Amino acid sequence: GISGASRMGTKLAISDERYREALALIKAKDEGVAATMQLSRYLGLRNEEAVQAVKSIKTWKQAILRGDERVRVIFGTKGGRARDTRVVDKEKVLSAINEAILCAEKNNGKLIDMPSLQQALDRYINIMRRVGGLKYENSNHSLRYAYAQDAEKYYISKGFTQKEASALTSIDLGHGDGRGDYIKRV
């Protein structure tokens, strides 16, 4: 932000255990919110990207089945800039996509069946907070942080240096290049 205050350590990557616990609670309340949450966790999507992901899930599925290692995030991106995001865990991403496809078929072609994007976003955030308890250090943004950690580990396992892994992950998150030090604070 503009204040110049450090945001270091204000949010944490959600643990797998806490994620599964929240997901189970949320799934019981709203399957669409749960499906959206899974896409966010395994593709590092921002809230608006996750809510609008329904427009791309079939394309993403085809891309992954074709062997692509990235999917293109087009809708809901910051500044309308499309980006390619690394598929770190193919099985989990495909499972999340398949669940989202089934969900959309039951929900008038939407993941969260609300009249407007803003109402869908509000419902997504509210259910994650109230039902899943995802707030403070375990906010919904902690899903994106968890993806970032997975992506960084993936790149390091492929032989990239820590600095390269941070830069590549930064690009996956849609931060552009040259902001690699952001990831180290995740």
Language-model features: locations:
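Basic, Lys/Arg- and aromatic-enriched nucleic-acid-binding interface segment
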Residues: D16-N47
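Flexible interdomain linker/hinge and immediately adjacent N-terminus
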Residues: G1-E21, K78
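Alpha-helix N-cap/helix-start motif at helix boundaries, enriched for small hydrophobics
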Residues: M37, E48-A53, T169
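Short, basic interhelical loop/turn and adjoining N-cap
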Residues: K58-K61, G174-Y182
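Residue-level marker of regulatory loop/turn positions in helix-turn-helix DNA-binding domains and
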Residues: A28-G32, L39, Y136, N140-H141, ...
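Conserved tyrosine-mediated DNA breakage-rejoining catalytic core shared by Y-recombinases
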Residues: Q52-S95
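Active-site/catalytic core of tyrosine-dependent DNA strand-transfer enzymes
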Residues: V88-K153
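C-terminal catalytic core of tyrosine-transesterase DNA break-rejoin enzymes
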Residues: Q38, S142-D177
